[in-house]
Amino acid sequence: MKKLISLFLVLIICCFMCGCGKEEIPSSDVTGTTNIKQGIVSEDFNEKGTGKLKCSQEAVAGEGIDVDLSYLVSYKNGNILELVSIQKVVSSDKSSLDLYENAYRGISKNYDNLKYYDGVVVRDSNSVTYTITINYDKIDIKKLLEIEGEEDNIVKNGKAKLSLWLDLAGKMGTVCEEV
């Protein structure tokens, strides 16, 4: 759970400093979509099959800072096989980018020696992008839990559970659709 908390730490810092807003998306009758007002529920998706979810979360990080959060979740039989998280912060303010870059690098450092957990921070002149790829199908779950802690995480019986991730993501205002 520490990883998930860490992933959202930067967003929370940003929200605390600058406020946070959500764009209300109209409801859809298409299976596999949901809106922020409704929240994500695992029953919206075919957990018993194999599939991919494309998810996004919008955040307002203050004047001159744009934050885009997106996730690609591959799953089979209710278990997450792979999770790709992309967090991109765009700003012309160097000090804001420094704050995000340092936070992302600090988070990523905790996982440096964990095989099948890849965290990459890329900085350019007006953005910082933090991409995390976790192969839950191959990662050593015990080592992952040593880093993250066993309390309040998405792992149950040694597997990363889609329903638990969807519950957590839904609380953060994440919107998903099957792809």
Locate the predicted segments by residue.
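Positively charged n-region of N-terminal signal peptides that target proteins for export
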Residues: 1-5, 11
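Intrinsically disordered, low-complexity repeat segments enriched in small/polar residues
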Residues: 6, 34-37
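C-terminal motif of bacterial Sec signal peptides marking the signal peptidase cleavage site
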Residues: 15-19
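Bacterial signal peptide processing site
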Residues: 21-23
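Surface-exposed, beta-sheet-biased, low-hydrophobicity segments with strongly acidic/polar composition
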Residues: 25-28
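Subset-of-secretome marker
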Residues: 36-179
